[in-house]
Regions:
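Rossmann-fold NAD(P)-dependent oxidoreductase module
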Residues: 84, 88, 163, 266
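ATP-dependent carboxylate-amine ligase
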Residues: 1-23, 91-92, 166-358
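Residue-level signal for inorganic ion chemistry
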Residues: 44, 79, 129, 163, ...
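Phosphate- and divalent-cation-binding pockets in alpha/beta enzyme and binding domains
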Residues: 75, 146-149, 262-263, 308-309
Length: 358
């Protein structure tokens, strides 16, 4: 089993550097006095989570389920992994569908995310996944509801990939992939004294990490992932430009993601001089965004933010992210998939009393 073709070719010989400073170091990276004072609340959080886990009865989707998630608060790079896994499945004869909660949307119902769906209706990541994979994507607070709707509209779907949802225990799963960014597990404490959503290590099928392996590692196989920027960017006017061309002049960059400093560092790694940067809250809608530079300075953003930014600045250049995973990971995934027989049984009926708040 070979690694699937990369989603977009990377610029040569441009490895990702350590993330650029994006403000003060997170207090979750050390066990300082403030975090120690919050530690008792972490123990309460642990007890409540354990109680929640005990009362769950996982509901089966009727087809195999892969969950791509993390155990830390904030972004860890789950969505690019989801995109890569879905592409792999499509290339190997599966017909995958994607479900997500749709973080950042203003709606609360279960609905399909289409390539042109506004982010405020379906969330940033689901719309991006619909555009980049072509797979059907449904969002719902309870992911089993999204599974039911997806399979009703696309009955040929024979495997589900959940973008996030490692803690959504109401949905039974066959494969779990846990993703870490460069911060690893931080100070190793649970919320609010640390970044962990649940105790780590925990059983998963595989761990994927950027930077150094998270410590402690756990018993699951671990694989390093590499992220690079695609060699070309595109704007809302349908135009494309080579990143090497953008490197010939200072640019303005904006990002409304969990770790904007990482995006800015990747631009700098390509030799692109940054005249100004703006870090907005994750999932920000750009309604009040104003430029710091003149309109003759190119404006760059992430692919996730592009559709929202284009409403006011269609000339902004969206820079796609490319993810590469080692061949050993794809071999492991192939072995795990070989254990699963594509089925087409109806999903279990949703009982609202069995579904938790995650």
């Amino acid at each position: 089993n070979k690694q699937p073709a990369t989603l977009r070719a990377a610029l040569p010989n441009r490895p990702l550097p350590p993330p650029a400073p994006s403000g003060q170091r997170s207090p979750w990276q050390r066990r300082g006095l403030g975090m120690r004072l919050l530690w008792p609340l972490s123990q309460l959080y642990r007890a409540l989570q354990a109680w929640h886990a005990r009362r769950q009865r996982p509901i089966h989707a009727g087809v195999p389920v892969i969950v791509v998630g993390n155990v830390i608060a904030g972004g860890a790079g789950k969505t690019p992994v989801t995109q890569a896994v879905v592409t792999y499945l499509q290339q190997h004869g599966w017909q995958p569908g994607i479900v997500s909660r749709g973080y950042g949307r203003r709606t609360t119902d279960c609905r399909q995310a289409l390539p042109d769906s506004p982010a405020h209706e379906v969330g940033d990541e689901p719309a991006l996944l619909a555009r980049t994979t072509g797979a059907p994507v449904f969002v719902a607070r309870q992911r089993i509801e999204a599974v039911q709707a997806l399979r009703a509209h696309y009955p040929a779907t024979n495997i589900i990939v959940s973008d996030d949802g490692l803690q959504h225990l109401a949905l039974a799963r066959d494969i779990e992939l846990c993703v870490f960014n460069e911060d690893g597990v931080g100070n190793g404490w649970l919320l609010p004294a640390g970044p962990l959503r649940e105790p780590w290590p925990r059983p998963v099928t595989a761990t994927l990490y950027a930077g150094q392996p998270p410590q402690p590692m756990g018993s699951a196989p671990a694989f390093a992932l590499q992220r690079r920027l695609a060699p070309t960017a595109y704007n809302g006017l349908g135009e494309h430009i080579d990143l090497l061309t953008l490197a010939q002049q200072p640019v303005e960059a904006v990002a409304a993601i969990a770790r904007p400093g990482a995006f800015f560092a990747m631009l700098q790694a390509q030799g692109i001089p940054l005249a100004a940067t703006q870090s907005l809250p994750d999932h920000a809608d750009f309604a009040h965004f104003s430029r710091q530079c003149g309109h003759d300075t190119p404006l760059l953003c992430t692919e996730k933010d592009a559709r929202k930014l284009w409403c006011q600045h269609p000339q902004a250049w969206a820079v796609p992210l490319q993810l590469q995973l080692p061949a050993d990971f794809w071999d492991l995934l192939a072995r795990e998939l070989a254990k699963l027989q594509p089925t087409n049984s109806p999903p279990e009926h949703v009982n609202a009393t069995t579904i938790g708040p995650f």
